[in-house]
Regions:
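Accessory beta-strand-rich segments of carbohydrate-active enzymes
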Residues: 10-14, 48, 69-189
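Coil residues (strongly favoring Ser/Thr
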Residues: 3, 17-19, 54, 59
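Short beta-strand segments of immunoglobulin-like
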Residues: 191-193
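Surface-exposed, low-complexity/disordered Ser/Thr/Gly/Pro/Asn-rich loops and linkers
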Residues: 43-66
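Predominantly extracellular/luminal regions of secreted and cell-surface proteins
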Residues: 9-10, 14, 21-50
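Extracellular carbohydrate-recognition regions
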Residues: 1-11
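A short, local hydrophobic-aromatic micro-motif
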Residues: 5, 30-33, 175, 188
């Protein structure tokens, strides 16, 4: 995945039993919304023209927030770059908010749980190096009324009298998603004291 990848988004409740099929490369996406990545679920719906621009008038107050305060699937397909000739292939997430369950080709890679959480997965054994790969992320919004109090630095992101509450609590794939390639050993985040 990189800037050339086309993401789609849809509420989990609307995929119903199809969620078992969405990992197939021939899965129909005609009623899915084009997703903005990096971005939020709500910003994708605004960009698609399904919500009015929240920056004008009282549009933000007219949004049915229950529509966004629920789980959403993000989905894309990608191929491995021909330049990847080293042993290991890594999938990087620079930010998912608030909670994201990551699947590649139907296999669960893991859970990223936190505000703008980052993650890295070794996908070498699961990747289809010669064909299409399906990446799906189930982004979940906290379902309790004090959700933003879990992180004191995040409290002022919305919901006070001076800034309206953002539908979905800014949930989505909020930063870059990309692949990298390495040899069998890597050194990351060295710190010398």
């Amino acid at each position: 995945p990189d800037s050339n990848v086309h993401w789609k988004v849809k509420p989990q409740a609307e995929t119903d039993t199809d969620s078992l099929q969405l990992f197939r490369s021939d899965y129909p996406l005609k009623d899915w919304v084009d997703a903005i990545v990096p971005g939020t679920v709500f910003s994708s719906y605004v960009a698609a023209g399904l919500e009015k621009d929240p920056n004008f008038g009282d549009n933000i107050y007219q949004v049915d927030k229950t529509k966004y305060d629920r789980s959403y699937w993000y989905r894309t397909e990608f191929s491995v770059p021909a330049s990847f000739t080293q042993e290991k292939i890594w999938l990087h997430f620079q930010g998912i908010n608030r909670r994201g369950e990551v699947f590649l080709n139907g296999h669960r890679l893991g859970l990223l749980d936190g505000f703008m959480h980052r993650g890295k997965f070794d996908i070498t054994a699961l990747i289809n190096p010669a064909g299409r790969n399906v990446l799906a992320v189930l982004v979940q919004t906290p379902q309790h009324p004090m959700a933003n109090f879990a992180s004191p630095t995040y409290i002022c992101s919305g919901g006070w009298d001076w800034i309206p509450y953002v539908p979905g609590l800014n949930s989505g794939i909020t930063d870059k998603v990309f692949l990298s390639n390495s040899g069998p050993v890597t050194l990351e985040d060295p710190w010398i004291r």
